[in-house]
Amino acid sequence: MCHSHRRIFSQLAQQLIREGKKDKAKAALDYAEKMIPAFNVPYDWQNGAVQMAEAYYQLGDSTKADDMMKALADKAVEYLTWYLSMDDNRFSISTREFEYHWAVLDAEVKIMKKYNSKLAEIYAPKVEELYNLYAERYERLQKMEKK
């Protein structure tokens, strides 16, 4: 339920920004942060958090935007690292989940770059590093299956 509420607030903020009502957009975002705090409902790609961060970037509040994007990127990195720590059997049945979280992290980095966030310098190399680890492992597993 709170996932959809955060998403609705992000949509409201984006519409207010399009209408030039930046003060109202900022107030809506701040209200959503107060009423749906991340410690109760963690930021997630699917619950409007990315759109909220992007709205904060558009409003010039890069500190709040970066805080949200960092939490989102850290979550993706944590999942990706966890998948890579699995044994070969579990890893091979989790490749779609890995690919999903990798795509999420990649998209988050693109948003960071779009708004010239210094976070991109931290997470862009992670995207490449994690993908390379995945590709090496996936290739090794494919070779093992052919034998």
Predicted regions and their residues:
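C-terminal luminal/periplasmic domains and tails of membrane-associated envelope-modifying transferases
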Residues: M1-K147
